Amino acid sequence: MKTLAIETSCDDTSLAIVSEENGNFQVEDILAYSQIQEHQKFGGVVPELASRLHSEKIIAILQSLGLERIKEVDFISVTTEPGLPGSLVVGKTVASLLGEFYQKEVVPVYHIWGHVFSILLERNIQDLKLPMVILTASGGHNDIYLIEDQSAQTQKKSDFPQWEYAGFKITKL
């Protein structure tokens, strides 16, 4: 399985080719444009500037990654939420256009799950020791999650939000 991953949730424009075979996740290629210098003079991220810079840079990044490589991927994954609305629209629009042109499924990815499951990159999924606790620190979305096998029988109160995702049970603590 191979995906073109598109991330434009805030002030970095990132595209990657990520593959999985027999539980091994590999980043084949990643290119990114950081907007830090443009935003520093304002003392923080300016949403309108961020989305404009995504629009200006994403096609050049895609071309550097190699348009012909899109034919190799099984699907296109794109960050959906949370994030800056204008920035997210740029990524979703490019993903939708590429999906339509190359006849590839576009898979929305919840931004925070991207952080949580980045632990799988360059590893075999079988090497993960569950249960585990993960701290995410991403802008205003700083949380602690308990990750268990999806089949885990837990005694936890139901007042904690829970999700099942990619074969894992996730509890926000």
What are these regions (language model features)?
Residues 1-173:
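Short acidic/glycine-rich loops and adjacent helix/strand connectors
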